Amino acid sequence: ADNMSLTGLSDEEAKEFHSIFMQSFLIFTAVAVVAHFLAWAWRPWIPGAEGYG
């Protein structure tokens, strides 16, 4: 176990994986935010003072 982590990845491989993971996560989150905004514009899921009227 010379200089290996629990995953078996080297430090460089772990950093590369992390950057790809974070980029993918941010893209997924951005798509989710846009989808929620569009769904809210189509049909808000929290009624206003007047209800769903």
Curated annotation (Swiss-Prot):
Cytoplasmic side: 1-19
Primary location: membrane
NCBIfam families for the chain: pufB_517_ASD (NF040862)
Annotated protein name in UniProt: Light-harvesting protein B800/850/890 beta-1 chain
Pfam families found in the cross-reference section: LHC
Membrane-related topology note: Single-pass type II membrane protein
Single GO biological process annotation from the record: photosynthesis, light reaction
Periplasmic side: 43-53
Subunit organization: The core complex is formed by different alpha and beta chains, binding bacteriochlorophyll molecules, and arranged most probably in tetrameric structures disposed around the reaction center. The non-pigmented gamma chains may constitute additional components.
